């Protein structure tokens, strides 16, 4: 038993950063609202998370000026569906602001937060359940990942092939990424304050050493 769980049963919360604007792709509409099979992409994502019974709630972090979500998912907000327009200038800032929102809504340091990208609509509820099972008794947490299948090449300074990278023990990080709130929040804050480039939650935790 670790220090987070003494006498307290931790809850699981999903946090979905959904504040992207589509600026990197040049799209007129953010990719999370692109239509897929008759629904906005993010709707499929949230439907999958809704099938995970162990999630106490799912918090969607939107840009302050988002004017698409309410029309796209009019029935989402409720007891297990939370929305906060606290998105930041980067994904990491949006997640950090979302963590603060969870605290404001009563989440405790021992609770688990599963951060999942809004655009990853193919996530399966059973995969999320397996992640929760795998991390429930862990001190730190974990993430979904796939073993690398492609051949990787190392480039030199002139963008010429310098060698082949061994794929042994190499994995492609996926989401959700599951960490305790009391660990992830200070890890992400420290990385942002230090100007460290954070590409996912695991990299923030790794930066703690």
Question: At which residue positions do the language-model features occur?
Answer:
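Conserved core of the sugar-phosphate nucleotidyltransferase
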Residues: 109, 123-209
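Acidic helix N-cap motif at the loop->helix transition within catalytic regions
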Residues: 67-73
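Short phosphate-binding loop-to-helix
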Residues: 74-111
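Acidic metal-phosphate-binding loop of nucleotide-sugar-dependent transferases
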Residues: 91, 118-122
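N-terminal glycine-rich phosphate-binding loop and ensuing alpha1 helix
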Residues: 2-67, 81
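Short active-site oxyanion
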Residues: 54-58, 82, 140, 190-193
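Residues at secondary-structure transition points
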Residues: 28-31, 36, 40, 85-93, ...
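Short aromatic-hydrophobic micro-motifs that form the base-stacking/packing surface
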Residues: 112-116
């Amino acid at each position: 038993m670790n220090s987070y769980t003494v006498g307290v049963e931790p809850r699981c919360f999903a946090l979905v950063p959904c504040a992207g604007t589509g600026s990197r792709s040049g799209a007129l509409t953010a990719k999370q609202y692109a239509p897929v099979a008759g629904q906005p992409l993010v709707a499929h994502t949230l439907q999958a998370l809704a099938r995970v019974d162990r999630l106490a709630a799912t918090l969607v972090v939107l840009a302050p000026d988002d004017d698409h979500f309410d029309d796209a998912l009019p029935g989402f907000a409720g007891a297990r569906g939370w929305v906060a327009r606290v998105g930041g200038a980067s994904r990491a800032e949006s997640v950090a602001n979302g963590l603060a929102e969870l605290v404001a809504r009563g989440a405790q340091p021992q609770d688990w937060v599963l951060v999942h990208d809004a655009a990853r609509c193919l996530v399966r509820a059973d995969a999320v359940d397996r992640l929760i099972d795998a991390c429930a008794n862990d001190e730190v947490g974990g993430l979904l990942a796939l073993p690398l299948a492609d051949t990787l090449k190392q480039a030199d300074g002139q963008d010429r092939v310098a060698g082949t990278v061994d794929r042994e023990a190499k994995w492609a990080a996926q989401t959700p990424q599951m960490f305790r709130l009391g660990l992830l929040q200070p890890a992400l804050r420290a990385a942002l304050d230090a100007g460290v480039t954070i590409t996912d939650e695991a990299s923030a935790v790794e930066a703690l050493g």
